[in-house]
């Protein structure tokens, strides 16, 4: 009889425990913030200093996690002042790439409402054969500003390395 009471108590406790759980569809919940970030490789180190290579072009891709609710205006630019941060983070001794060796034809982009990305930002490198082969150069390109959304700080900048 005691065993019967214990089984009945256990069954009642189990029923209360199981029925007390909330039935929510966790797939409908967002467990992240919708922030803008650079989705291309953070460090592009395939740019070589060679007499035969005078020009190169690279692109920065960016995106947000969920479709935009409204248009997002984004501005990019080179940030040579971030060279020291690059050297500290990646334990390097690179020099900032001089402005005469690159151009960014279009420094703004727009992610339209309902989209998660837009056209890539193009960086044109020129006269790279004039760089000193004994040095490493870095060009940090960063998101300066974005309207209607926050920028993910850890993925705000892309670094282009010449070696």
List each language-model region with its residue ranges.
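First exposed extracellular module after export/assembly in secreted or surface-exposed proteins
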Residues: 38-163
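Bacterial Sec-dependent N-terminal signal peptides
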Residues: 3, 13-44, 157-163
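Bacterial N-terminal signal peptides that target proteins for export
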Residues: 1-8
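A generic signature of intrinsically disordered, low-complexity regions enriched in glycine/proline
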Residues: 10, 28-29, 50, 149
């Amino acid at each position: 009889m005691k065993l019967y009471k214990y089984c009945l108590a256990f069954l009642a406790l189990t029923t209360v425990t199981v029925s007390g759980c909330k039935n929510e569809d966790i797939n409908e919940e967002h467990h992240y913030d919708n922030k803008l970030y650079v989705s291309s490789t953070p460090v592009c180190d395939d740019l070589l200093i060679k007499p035969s290579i005078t020009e190169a072009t690279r692109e920065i891709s960016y995106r947000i996690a969920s479709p935009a609710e409204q248009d997002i205006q984004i501005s990019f630019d080179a940030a040579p002042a971030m060279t020291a941060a690059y050297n500290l983070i990646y334990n390097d001794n690179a020099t900032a790439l001089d402005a005469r060796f690159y151009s960014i034809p279009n420094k703004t982009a727009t992610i339209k409402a309902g989209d998660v990305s837009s056209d890539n930002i193009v960086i044109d490198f020129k006269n790279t054969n004039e760089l000193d082969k004994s040095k490493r150069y870095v060009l940090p390109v960063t998101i300066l500003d974005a309207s209607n959304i926050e920028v993910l700080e850890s993925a705000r900048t892309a670094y282009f390395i010449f070696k």
